[in-house]
């Protein structure tokens, strides 16, 4: 009788390499799955390593465009920053990884999927909730959570089974990266008082090493979608990667954040998101120009909720779908160009224009070109302040009629 098949989310690192052998010992034929999310990893090497360790098959799938257009774009249009800081780098990729795991499992006739998450992070929740939403019949196995080995025990197991030890194993940091940014934790970063060492960063220059001359760029949007950079059209994934290089050179997008994890603990994380931060700032400025006041004031409530829903692993939920439906409606007129200066860690918006601009210079100006009806303000103020005026009159009358105590 053939062994049951299992699809493993494979990164090429020690944990998921050891997981292949560990799962085989438990009777599974392991199919490795690695996605290209724009992190710049040597995926041919990863594919061959999975097969060398013992996977019966190894998938490598380029999902950069899908990730940019269907996941990162929603976060951008929501100006999504969890707790006002984190652009949801890892949180955005997990539902897409889960989706591909399920697709391959169904294609291969697998009975289970597995991931390499620990028992104290958010990702285990994101993966497992997403997988069960997409296919409730699949079993989900978390080898790292189950085996509870020390790092030394894991290395010993790897040596015993001839599993290659990564050359960067001595690095104290735990890193996750995709085209939307890079997250870094562990090592000295676990001390919230300790300054992140420069070796913790890869995508961004320090302020000291950033150029002394700014770059001024122009980002074009169509219905909330970034489509051009300095007048040149790019697919969204490529545009984000181009911005990572441009803004990263100037130190834009470094984030040092003590965040509240879904599992109940606080965690100190260091993020680099040069492209994401630059795009969010530009997009928000274009919205300020094109959204009516009521939508502009209400949308941040939806934005905060979308950020929480994504962070908490509820991508495939009815609530997320409903929130995104509102979000998409707001983007119909978010078309135009934003000019941004990149300099010493800052993305500074210096100009914005749109064919749907609600800014009317003849109404806003204080020059002789002014077309605003100043006399209309008299009646407006009277009606606007009427409830407050009536309240004040009634209170004064009641106070006057109340006898003072002896």
From Swiss-Prot:
Q: What is its EC number?
A: 6.3.4.5
**Binding-site residues, ATP:** 9-17, 116
- List of residues binding L-citrulline: 86, 122, 126, 174, 183, 259, 271
Carries keyword Membrane? no
| GO CC annotation, single | cytoplasm
Reactions it catalyzes: L-citrulline + L-aspartate + ATP = 2-(N(omega)-L-arginino)succinate + AMP + diphosphate + H(+)
Record-level GO BP terms: argininosuccinate metabolic process; L-arginine biosynthetic process; urea cycle
Amino acids binding L-aspartate: 118, 122-123
User: Which pathway does the record list?
Assistant: Amino-acid biosynthesis; L-arginine biosynthesis; L-arginine from L-ornithine and carbamoyl phosphate: step 2/3
EC class name: ligase
This entry's Gene Ontology molecular function terms read: argininosuccinate synthase activity; ATP binding
Q: Which HAMAP family match?
A: Arg_succ_synth_type1 (MF_00005)
The UniProt family comment states: Belongs to the argininosuccinate synthase family. Type 1 subfamily.
Q: What NCBIfam families would the database entry show?
A: argG, PRK00509.1
Protein name, UniProt field: Argininosuccinate synthase
- Species of origin reads Geobacillus kaustophilus (strain HTA426)
Give the encoding gene's name: argG
